[in-house]
């Protein structure tokens, strides 16, 4: 019986997801090791060469997608990760998504415009495919936001805040119930159409829809597996009309 239990531990895998504001110290920069991110990612991925799949946000913009994908691959290789394969999932490779997902160890959900990526994810039937995925998911910015069961689309492009047809809640991938807003220190200073990102858009939306938001600075991330989720690093939450800082860098917070 003991042998059988040990065998199960080695063979039964479940998905692990890392939802980041950004895994890098700067745009197109090296991996950020803050809050033990690199160590935990190494532990989750193991030592074997990886089969990675990078999901772009703009499937029809090949140059932009290739640049983002290549920068992410280089950042991983620079800290010692090796790849057996590394595939950019865009319009050209979309027909092979089921086969690619079956061989994938590391699924990277890129950043940028959430609604555009959300549309592509549903075209790929990714919410269905990801339910059977047993590898590691890495969410980056918009990719992290789209990982929620019901994703919140922050109006960040001119015209979106006042567009009555702009859907702020959209079905996501269903990895988590939490809605994470990335790049806290950058976004809190930004405005769009004369509105402050946080004070005039996200906080009123939290009240309107009755949903809490987790605000992550770069370097903070959420790890989830088997229904348990923890945040590593500094983050803030707006819930029930209250905006508060929950944790600082270096701290781990278990989410309820």
Where in the sequence are the language-model features?
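Short, well-ordered alpha-helix to beta-strand connector turns
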Residues: 104, 133-134, 176
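Structural motif
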Residues: 18, 106-110, 138-139, 179-180
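Short, Lys/Arg-enriched N-terminal segments with co-localized hydrophobic residues
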Residues: 1-14
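C-terminal and late-domain segments of enzyme folds
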Residues: 15-47, 59, 66, 70, ...
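Catalytic-core regions built around general acid/base machinery
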Residues: 100, 123-135
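Catalytic nucleophile loop
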Residues: 110, 131-150
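Glycine/threonine-rich flexible loop motifs
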Residues: 114-123, 191
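Portal/gating segments that form or line small-molecule/metal binding sites
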Residues: 54-55, 59-116
